[in-house]
Design a protein with these regions (language model features):
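Peripheral/terminal regions associated with large enzymatic or DNA-binding modules
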Residues: 2-100, 105-321
Length: 321
């Protein structure tokens, strides 16, 4: 049974980038509501500078150094570290939700309040899956601090997962193999909705090329757009009563479906497609991704067909009044 009085947990995933991590830590300490959270730091490998930044900057309840055997790809190490952090947040701290920050995600002073407000507002909705903190919508495009959208999408770049969602993705995160963690959890996220602000509550300073998968001109441009969208200091304080759901596009990727910009039929199709993707992922997990069974059952072909539906849904506009 969930302990409703337990504090939410912030999991900080760190590696060798102590300078970036310092900026993340400083932004967290300055964020409104920081004292209401437990903090768990996870350092991937022997990086004493990063360990020191976490210990002295955040004074975490738990600080763990993880050693991985063999030569794992960075995405596999990140996935395993994430699994450790989420498991401790929900099983050890009994948190109602867990916030995950990598060592290049700098937060605004409203980030923690925004996550708390969204959780309070949506936690009882059975379709609520998670909260993201990012956006690249500029104030010049009419984005207000109060506004948010519901997306049929996944999570990343400063996000929070409620306990109920973790129960559904826990086994998927434990899968062995060469997987991106966000790809493992995305099918379940698409069975409902995630919340994104129109004004960003985070920036990704890893778009300078120091990250494992960043540094291209496209990434750098995205970083600039996130910075232009970022909420300023003391510009806004989110509560469960002053946030406003808006029906509009959310420019990001072709497979991001802005649910409230669709009619009722479009939303049902998006949810239904997500359910099928999630069931397919669960089936492949149960079969341990066996090439023989995957081929015999045509699972890869079915998955490709389902994935083709998503950009078409994302391109739709409201058809019904």
């Amino acid at each position: 049974m969930q302990n409703t009085s337990a504090s939410p947990t912030i999991v900080v995933l760190a590696h060798r980038r102590a300078d970036h991590l310092f900026q993340v830590v400083e932004s967290l300490r300055a964020a409104s509501g920081f004292s209401r959270h437990r903090v768990l730091g996870i350092v991937d490998g022997e990086w004493p500078d990063s360990t020191k930044v976490l210990r002295e900057g955040l004074d975490p309840q738990l600080l763990i150094r993880v050693r991985h055997e063999g030569h794992l790809h960075p995405r596999n190490r990140i996935a395993r570290n994430l699994q450790i952090g989420l498991d401790l947040a929900f099983s050890h701290f009994s948190s109602p939700y867990c916030i995950v920050l990598e060592d290049d995600i700098v937060v605004s002073d409203d980030f923690l309040d925004f996550v708390a407000a969204v959780h309070a507002k949506h936690a009882k909705n059975p379709l609520f899956r998670a909260v993201n903190g990012f956006s690249k919508v500029s104030p010049k495009a009419g984005a207000l601090p109060s506004d948010y959208v519901r997306l049929n999408y996944g999570v990343g770049w400063g996000w929070a997962l409620p306990r109920r969602s973790y129960r559904q993705v826990q086994k998927l995160l434990a899968r062995c193999g060469d997987f991106h963690w966000d790809g493992l959890v995305e099918p379940f996220m698409r069975t409902g909705y995630v919340v994104n602000p129109l004004r960003s509550r985070v920036i990704n300073i890893g778009f300078d090329g120091s990250g494992a998968h960043t540094g291209s001109e496209e990434h750098q441009n995205t970083g600039r757009q996130m910075a232009s969208s970022l909420l300023g200091p003391s510009e806004w304080r989110s509560t469960s009563t002053n946030l406003r759901l808006v029906a509009r596009d959310f420019p990001w990727r072709q497979d991001v479906v802005p649910l409230d910009a669709l009619g009722a039929t479009g939303r049902l199709l998006a949810y239904g497609n997500g359910v099928l993707l999630f069931l397919l992922s669960a089936l492949r997990y149960g079969l341990r991704n066996s090439p023989v069974w995957t081929s015999l059952l045509g699972l890869r072909r079915i998955r490709r067909l389902l994935l083709r539906v998503i950009p078409r849904l994302a391109a739709q506009r409201r058809q019904e009044g």
